[in-house]
Amino acid sequence: MSRRWKAIGAFAIAGVVAAIAVTAAAAHSSSKHSTTFSGTLNIMGFGTNGDDVAKNRFAIAQKAVAPAKVNAPNGGFNEQQFLTDIASKQVPDLVYWDRSYVGTYAAKGALMPLDSCIKSDKIDTSQYRQAALQSVTYNGHIYGIPEFFDVRTLIVDTHVADTSGVTGKMLNTANPTVLKQAALKMYQHSGSQVTRIGFDPKLPEFFPLWAKAFGANILSKDGLHPDLNSPQAIAALTYANSLIQAQGGYNAFLAFRNTWDFFGSDNQVAKNQVGAWPMEEWYYNVLASSSPNVNVTAIPFRSKTGDPINYSTGSAWSIPKGAKNAAAACQWMKTMTNASTWETVANIRKAAYAKAGQYWTGLFTANSKADAAINKPTSGEPKKWASIINTVEAAEKYSFALPASPASAQFNTAWTNAVNRVLQGQQSPTQALNQAQKEAVAAIKQATKK
Amino acid sequence: MATAAVATRRPGPGDRARRWASGFRERDTWWAYAFLVPWAFGFVVFTAGAMVWGAIISFTNYSVVAPSHSVGLANYRQIASDPYALLSLKNSFEMTAIYVPFEMGLALLFASMLARVTRFDGFFRTVYYLPVMTPTVAIGGMYLLMFNGPYGLVDQFLGYLHIPEPYWLTDPNWIKPGIAAMLVWQVGGNTVLYLAAIKNVPQQLYEAASIDGASAWRRFKDVTLPMISPTLFFTFVILTVYGLQVFDQIYTAFYNPSNAKISSDTSLMYVIYLFQQAFDYLHMGFASAMAWLLFGIIMVITAFQILVSKRFVYYEGEQR
């Protein structure tokens, strides 16, 4: 039998196993609630065309709200469509979106606070990670049930590091001077063209992580007071920008980075085009499936005090005000995010991966109980992937998130534009962040004006 | 006398109304209106209706999700004091000023070349027109690949010619020319229009000019250009409006959430900022005021273009 047919057979068996597991999990889940659901549960942002984890959880949650019908058109959250729905008073019962939306819509009164849902369905909020909960909590009320949880660690191409004489200890963000030396050791160029990035600080996207590492809280816990131009934030941007400027300058640096085959087998790690960079945990899964033999490891991102830190983002479920089937929506959120559902689908994936000879790189959720149960290396897994799972799992505990803000989009635009102005040489970090601070303060003031 | 008086009387509104009503005795009139109704319905509901609604909410703090109230002219005043609104307007003007002559010049060059092709001319017209069929979002995506520093196809071509390759995506000096170059991808549409106009120029004019000893350049300057000036003027107006309103390609290339890393103050066009205000920040009232301001600006520019065109555009058969 060819490898291809073996793989097809493995996935077919895994499919049958998944069906049985999902049915069992659904029976387990539905036995816990006594409410009878009816009508249709309209969902925006979560269709039936996702990956195996999405599909299997969908099936479990669908059974948990039966006999209610589930209407979940494919496609991600569409803000324009959502606004149209609100304007026409035909809101979906449930939206699945990025947690950064929650504060803005909660502040404008477009979302249902979930206090009664959490109470009536006995949703254990202690199972969710604090950072995730913080990003869906506005004015003391929870407006979203967090789902996935991005964990950012340093991905290190160990081949590049070893051949450049860079050790793991040198790749320590707590020691900016040594880190820069390591970056320059791994950096390569040909004339004005970059041929290898030593260390990519991932600007502008990861500016909040650098700011936090340097001791800045760029937004207060209540999401109302930005502090983008603190000395720590300015120092963080100055340093992270200097890493790029020292490695060919922003133009050459980004142009080279844009050539990477990010999701393919000739990705930047496989081709040794980068030494190290901070990245979300899902990229280990990309590497494990597209180029499983790459020499790679994970190192936690550390603050200047030496402690690990993780800037977390992710998705959440929310119920818009005016939803007609809030009871089913509440049950759906609970089922989709509880530990048993995550465990069920993770086990299905592990079995499928094992049969297909693919490596398990973890599944990181906003549910700490679930993560503790599912993120254990599988037997026979190469050490490098096992070690990565352990590092990412450990980093989860040191997470922070940007709090829910009534002007999240404008706040994010303000600091993103500021970082880009610095990268493109139009302003100094101080000028750029001073401007961003003014813009963020004005935006939040306007958003909270009655 | 009475007959003469009737004959010289100008038709009044009543006459015009009677003539209009009498048209309905003809079957063709009913058919004409039947065909016009779908368009009229679409225009009233989706264009005129939306414009009127936009005008109304431009005087409110409407955000879709929260209760709104009247704010008078505050949104219009805020535009004047919003640095990004002014910056984006300036960017749009500058980019349009680069794009319009570039597009018109290139289209004219291609049309002049195609006008000389006698064999397989249909094939070449199709080939030049094909890029117009490319979805605008795809053009934005392709731009990132084709104009990526020294690695993109365009830059590699420039490198082959030993021309220094600009960083179109990130160098503030090159972002607007880069965007203009991206928009020129659809030059085929105007090429076909110019080609049709050139083909309509009477051959005897060229023959007469040749007999008078006019060079190819003089024939082009003094015969072709005046004769196709109505088409040039039409495209000049349309391209100016398009340049000030262009959205899809720039949004896809620079403002798609996954590409936020290359967005910049230089790539922020007026319509992009309008979209951000409306759909990212939920400032629908402010965005509507921005839209109406742009409408007014375009109207003024178009009126100015029409005024100036009287000196430069030659309409055959027009009485002067």
Task: Give the predicted meaning of each segment.
Chain A
Residues 206-209, 214, 237-335:
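Extracytoplasmic/periplasmic substrate-binding proteins
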Residues 100-152, 178-182, 297-299, 382-383:
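Hinge/lid segment of periplasmic solute-binding proteins
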Residues 283-293, 306-312, 318-413:
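C-terminal lobe and pocket-closing loops
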Residues 118-119, 137-206, 216-254, 321-327, ...:
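Helix-loop-helix "hinge/cap" segment bordering the ligand-binding cleft or interdomain interface
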Residues 73-82, 100, 174-178, 254-267, ...:
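Short helix-initiation/N-cap motifs at beta->coil->alpha
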Residues 80-91, 108, 160-161, 180-189, ...:
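Short helices/loops that flank or line small-molecule/ion binding pockets
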Residues 2-104, 119-126, 305, 340-344, ...:
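Conserved N-terminal structural module of periplasmic/extracytoplasmic solute-binding proteins
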Residues 64-74, 90-91, 165-171, 221-225, ...:
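A local structural motif
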